[in-house]
Amino acid sequence: MEPLNLDNLKSMLKSPDESSRKLALGILKANQKKIPKKDLVRLYKLVPARECVKSYKDVCIQLGIEEVTLENYSSIPEKERSRALNSHKLDNITRRFNGRKVTVKENRYMPYFIKEAAGWRFGVSFCWYSSASYVVVGFYFKNEEDSDYCGKTFIDIYSELLG
């Protein structure tokens, strides 16, 4: 079998042809353990996050970072570990989806959740545009579609953070 040609894979991922991009993404996912980490991160940057992120593990692979667990937070009080871990996860998720830090000079979207007897559920994404400071802690996205996707896909992480 011929070695994987990263330049060809890169060209396919940049292709305007959707079937070529889907094929390249399939090849990328199937071979990600064989591709050097820095090349893998570069290739995944070419793919919109909504097309290739289905889990927090995907986020870690695509950012080239190790997946952390509660054990990584053993130095802080036990009751604060889950919140710290989930906050860390959401920070990485927003970093993967935004590709950068969203600034105060642009629209920022944040998923909102509704508390019901059965638990939290995704409600809507809210656009936040202001240079004023508010006491809202949020993990902002640069567009509503990514905010909606993450609010629904990562509701378990948000639920644990919200309590």
What are these regions (language model features)?
Residues 1-2, 156, 160-163:
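Short intrinsically disordered terminal tails
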Residues 1-43:
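Short, low-complexity, charged amphipathic interaction modules
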Residues 9, 24, 43, 56-59, ...:
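Generic structural signal of hydrophobic/aromatic residues within well-ordered alpha-helices
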Residues 32-115:
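The feature represents the first ordered module of a protein
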Residues 34, 119-122, 146-149:
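Short, surface-exposed beta-strand/loop "edge" segments at domain boundaries and coil↔beta transitions
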Residues 104-136:
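Short aromatic-glycine-(Arg/Gly/Cys) micro-motifs in beta-strand/loop hairpins
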Residues 142-159:
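A short, charged, amphipathic alpha-helix used as a generic interaction element across diverse proteins
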